[in-house]
UniProtKB/Swiss-Prot annotation:
Protein name per Swiss-Prot or TrEMBL: Alpha-conotoxin-like Pu1.3
Covalent S-S links between cysteines: C24-C30, C25-C36
Propeptide section residues: 1-21
Location in the cell: Secreted
Cellular component annotations (GO), alphabetically ordered: extracellular region; host cell postsynaptic membrane
Stated role: Alpha-conotoxins act on postsynaptic membranes, they bind to the nicotinic acetylcholine receptors (nAChR) and thus inhibit them.
Any one GO molecular function term: acetylcholine receptor inhibitor activity
Family: Belongs to the conotoxin A superfamily.
Tissues with expression: Expressed by the venom duct.
Main location: secreted
Keyword annotations from UniProtKB, A to Z: Acetylcholine receptor inhibiting toxin, Disulfide bond, Ion channel impairing toxin, Neurotoxin, Postsynaptic neurotoxin, Secreted, Toxin
Amino acid sequence: SDGRNAGADRKGFGLISQMFKLSCCADPACKHTPGC
């Protein structure tokens, strides 16, 4: 159970990071960050 929960947490965090990266890369002040 703990392993599945950890995996779900990582997946959720990854999704949030992806959304943040998209909004950041669309922002002229932020799009120069690594990963854009």
